Amino acid sequence: MSQPIPSASPALAALIERAVARVRHALPADAPWPEGLEHPLARVALASDFVVDTLARQPALLAHLAQPDPPPLPVPRLDPAQPQEWAAQLRRYRAAASARLVWRDVLGLDDVDATLAGATMLAETCLQCALQALEQQFATRHGQVIAEDGSVQRLVVFGLGKLGGGELNFSSDVDLVYAYPQAGQSDGARPLAAEEYFARLGQQLAKLLDETTADGFSHRVDLRLRPFGSAGRVALSFNGMDQYFQREGRDWERYAWLKARPVAGDIAAGEAWLETLRPFVYRRYLDFTALDGLRDMKAAITAEVARHARLDDIKRGPGGIREIEFLVQSLQLIRGGREASLRERRLLPALQALVDLGQIDPPTGQALAEAYRFLRRVENRLQMLRDAQTHALPQGEPERERIALGLGYAHWQALLEALAPHRTRVAAEFAELLAPRVHATAPDTLADYWRALPEGDAAPLLGIGLHDPNNAHHMLADFAQSSGVRALSDGARTRLDRVMPALLHAAIRATQPDAALRRVLGLLQATLRRTSYLALLDEQPSALARLVDVLSRSALLAERLAAYPLLLDELLDTRISGPLPDRAALHTACVDTLQIDDTEAALRELNERRLALSFRIALATLDGRQQPVDSTQQLAWLAEAVVQTVLQLAQTQLQAAHGQVPGGAFAIIGYGSLGGMELGFGSDLDLVFLYDHPREVEASDGKRPLEAGRWFARLAQKVMTLLGAETGAGRLYDIDVRLRPDGGKGALVSSLASYRDYQRDRAWTWEHQALVRARAVAGDAALCEAFVQVRRETLTRVRDPALLHEDVRKMRARMRSELDRSDAGRLDLKQGAGGLVDLEFLLQAGVLGQAAQHPALLLACATPALIDALVQVQWLPAESAAPLHHAHATLVEAGLSCTLDRRPRLVVSTPPIRDACQIVAAIADAQQLRFQPGKGA
């Protein structure tokens, strides 16, 4: 026979030859020796004494493995009449199936991912097979557990750790937790309470799998991850589990339950209960407190490694498997409450999700994935050698040679050289994530000042850039002795003492240091009860610096951050400085919330997304990464998406209660800034509601029908209620419906026919002006198109130019007298002379006067598009286009700047603003639309 492993030492070659001979000898005398088996068997014998032992005990298995692509083995059927055979059947099956896993792995038929999945599937199969047999046995002895509501209760077996993640290594124990949905009692001749019933069942299951017999074991079972550990009950009801995690749940248990999965018993009930546990595992907001618990866990493992000299442990040692797991899981826990894609049990998909979200850069993600697969492959080979639960690199030369050659390396040193870069990279990435916060060693006057408060005086604050050091001192002293600070735990107080000096240094570097400090303290006061935000600022210095910068430049964002600390998450989102979402992405972000079954929860999530998205738009505006005119358009797109989402929510609610109006249609028309796609931060929405339905349909078709008109009125009311409902994230929008037909005196909803009649017969010129900027933003497509037709019919009416201009001027004069807040030194950007409303009136007059001849004008609603359209039809001279665009952009930018800093839109008339207003006024004059002078003129 030729040498099967050419590079094997003589001793190893002899060992392999003896192993092959042992397998051959175990075959019955009349059994044929499969052709071509010598070399594959030698390779497997090199890698695994366990497989050789198994083949010696089960020689018939060899013919199965000798197939070109050995399929799965048949699952044993445990005969209820022969429970004494169950253990042997399970152990023989597990040994044979494990031998198949080794065979496929060593011969390259499976990659490491498939091997891990196969080991997981084998454990699940044994669990399910054993539990099914035991359940039948218990039902015969004790009956089934029946809850108070009459439902049959079954045991739920949760797999944690690598079993839950579908990544079980070859010779791993299985971490199990037992639970059951409801309390009750069994209904058999020897009844048991549910707790006792399921505890006994769980203990029998563990024994059937774990106990070592003449046939070995099936799977080592570890029940220590259950609530209260070894001291806890073997099985708990879901209610008991809930109470435990609400009162006793610890940080390390979040890591343990991150991968949890029901693997046997009542799978559906287990999955449903895990959904209720999700808020414990994944906190709603960014949660950097998870890193403290992780540091403690890692420190304990590091101490154990050092104590037992386990530096060669590829699981727990430096740069080992555990560090990759901890790194990925910690980022999952920090962000998984906000990012559903991170709620992933499997490590490699979770790692890819982190890359996709920009939390790990692609090269690092690839390096970690390669390291993980390499380490798991080595780990499996260490365990496959003798079916031992080991993670330590071997010390003996024979074992080293076998592992190295089996993995395709010429010698042990070559394997170590391949392993070292992986461990080095993993250790470096892990250290960067979990490096303990460094305490300042150099003297820091501000740190000393803060720790001394409320004692001391303002002296340390003098000469460092504050305009009013004494006031700053009083603010800081009041904060230091506030009830919120006094109530902090020792750990949170330590964090605050680290954060405060950094915040003070950042504040005095700000353009407005006093305002920055005042706003920082307001934010801290609002967030002290959530220590996760202190942890965020402590763990992420870049977020701290960014926060103070934003607070110093925007009173509005300071208010929003203090009111809704969830926005702090946005400062760490890598997307915050990238391209802003387009119209389709904004729509998707909003309508995705409809997947949440609970209306209140969906509304809260929608609110949070609106807050986050408008915050991103505000930051882009503040940083100059986006033109203000573009920001107002994006804010309108966002509002449009929110209205569309809320309409669907409202329709679902109303239809559940009252059915729907057959053939009926409903549409929401956006007027004003929403219609003109020029929405500001905090703007309300001008809405008009339309409906239509077949004449013969009088009512909705539900169990509690409503008259058709009333149904649509109720729908409009629901939309308004949902848009204005208070949630933990505030409310969506304030709504103004006064632009509907007949204003405040009119019906909340208008039929299409009455709306058409009103626009034709009774609407004032100013209402037709408002219609210029109106557009359908949500609802039935056919009705929206019908609105477009009504708008077209109305706006293309032939008008007397002189009367039109007179009406426009009169309305503008009335608004000026009532709304213009300009004075001798300041201009009202919106209502002042040459301001935004003058520009709107100019363009609206142009459309009303020209649309009969040029209906293409009606395609435009937004100011920039209206300017271009009126130039195109030569109502505005071509040379006025650029100045008007510039004037509009200047006024919008000034207005947004005021809003972002919480100032009224009354500004000193600087040269750029004065020029913009003069351009608008001059062009209006040229069109015979000389508007009344402003109050400050």
Swiss-Prot record:
Names of the cofactor(s): Mg(2+)
Gene Ontology cellular component list: cytosol
Domain of life of the organism encoding this protein: Bacteria
Organism of origin: Xanthomonas campestris pv. campestris (strain B100)
Pfam families with a match to the protein in the record: GlnD_UR_UTase (PF08335), GlnE (PF03710)
Keywords, sorted A to Z: ATP-binding, Magnesium, Multifunctional enzyme, Nucleotide-binding, Nucleotidyltransferase, Transferase
GO-annotated biological processes: regulation of glutamine family amino acid metabolic process
InterPro entries: GlnE, GlnE_rpt_dom, NT_sf, PII_UdlTrfase/GS_AdlTrfase
Keyword set includes Nucleotide-binding: yes
One MF annotation (Gene Ontology) recorded for this entry: [glutamine synthetase]-adenylyl-L-tyrosine phosphorylase activity
Protein name (Swiss-Prot/TrEMBL): Bifunctional glutamine synthetase adenylyltransferase/adenylyl-removing enzyme
Biological role: Involved in the regulation of glutamine synthetase GlnA, a key enzyme in the process to assimilate ammonia. When cellular nitrogen levels are high, the C-terminal adenylyl transferase (AT) inactivates GlnA by covalent transfer of an adenylyl group from ATP to specific tyrosine residue of GlnA, thus reducing its activity. Conversely, when nitrogen levels are low, the N-terminal adenylyl removase (AR) activates GlnA by removing the adenylyl group by phosphorolysis, increasing its activity.
Cross-referenced PANTHER family: BIFUNCTIONAL GLUTAMINE SYNTHETASE ADENYLYLTRANSFERASE_ADENYLYL-REMOVING ENZYME, GLUTAMINE SYNTHETASE ADENYLYLTRANSFERASE
HAMAP family associated with the record: GlnE (MF_00802)
